[in-house]
Amino acid sequence: MAMSNLPRDLLEEVLSRVPVKSIAAVRSTCKNWNSLTYGQSFTKKLYGKTMATKEKEFLVVMTMDLEVYLMRVNLHGIHKDDNNVKSSIMQKAKLIRLNDDRVRVDDICKVFHCDGLLLCITIGIRLVVCNPYCGQTRCIKTRRDYHITDNYALGHEKMKNSPLRNYKILVFHDKSFLQNSWFEIYNFNSDSWKVLYFTCDWKLPFSQLVVSLKGNTYWFAREMYIHGPRIDLPDFLICFDFTTERFGPRLHLPFHSRCVDTVTLASVREEQLAVLFQDSKTLILEVWITTKIEPNAVSWSSKVFLEVNMSPLTGFQFNRSFGSFFIVEEKNVVVVPIKGGHFKRNLAYIIGKDEYFKEVDLGVPSSYIYFSPHVCSYVPSLVQIKKDAQVMLQHHNVSAEKHHEFCASL
């Protein structure tokens, strides 16, 4: 049987064994193979072949002191041997800028992830999209001057009868006391912006409380209160659907938080959404995971994933405005990055049941008090973007020229 006649699943299995550096040649062979290699199913197979040999390892993206790092996480055996904790979260690569002053990937204050692409927001409010796995970047020309408090999101439109995806960027300013507002959408395919107006009865407390899932973006939101500040307002999730280019209805949460409490979002396996809630009075931390999440509907697990009293462990509340976390389901733990050591160190707390609590130094000294470390999930992708310049991953203790070898080992 000819390769072109193989079932799609079998063809993906065969082509996923091709080295990463040869994928370009595969794509140029025929239209069918080119289309297939852009699909998430193929990417997962390609990535899974490498990671299957690495004992429960996975990657996350961390922003620390205005720089972006890929961190390799391996919590295998942490409960058995606490000596392994120091090496459980290790820096593997750093995003660096090469030979092009038009595209700066340093001084990055915010990063948003979708399908292996990173939307980086710089201190100077420049928008740069990069695929660190492929070493590509795209500098996005904006319509106007944006502000650090604007809300940003990266997602994709679902294309009918095609595995290809049309990626988009959403930017909007949450005017706390105005119901009539607008947002801007950048379309990668047309390289253009458009402005849409909408009416809302909610506000976003903090622009970092956001996660991309299945191409759509979810925010933690509160009901708008026009007549002044209140400490106790209805809270919920709001989704922006990049296919319809509309915000969805309010999605209920499994708890109620006050404005002084901590609420943070994270993705789980790129399929479900997790929410961390910490009461500011009791310091009790709860983590909940969805069983279904769509732009117009959500359901939650009947049992809390993790519940821990942080009062005897840390004695303080996690960051409300720039907090982040990720979970490791098989270990029943959450990992929360923080500023520690009188704001001189970037740390991560590993928190589990029965008061399991460990501290890991992330290996990047802290120089900026006001920029807490921020983590988001990361799954390598072969999504191609029209590039302006080449941005590489600087492997920890390895020269930048080793980029291709490092990509193959991700």
Curated annotation (Swiss-Prot):
Write down the Gene3D superfamilies for this protein, in alphabetical order. Answer: 1.20.1280.50
- Indicate the segments forming the F-box domain, all copies: 1-46
Source organism per UniProt: Arabidopsis thaliana (Mouse-ear cress)
The record's annotation in InterPro entries points to:
F-box-assoc_dom_typ1, F-box-assoc_interact_dom, F-box-like_dom_sf, F-box_dom, SCF_F-box_component
Name of the protein in its database record: F-box protein At5g36730
Task: Please give the start and end residues of each transmembrane region.
Answer: none
PROSITE patterns linked:
FBOX
Pfam families tied to this protein: F-box, FBA_1
Superkingdom assignment: Eukaryota
Q: Where in the chain are disulfide-linked cysteines found?
A: none
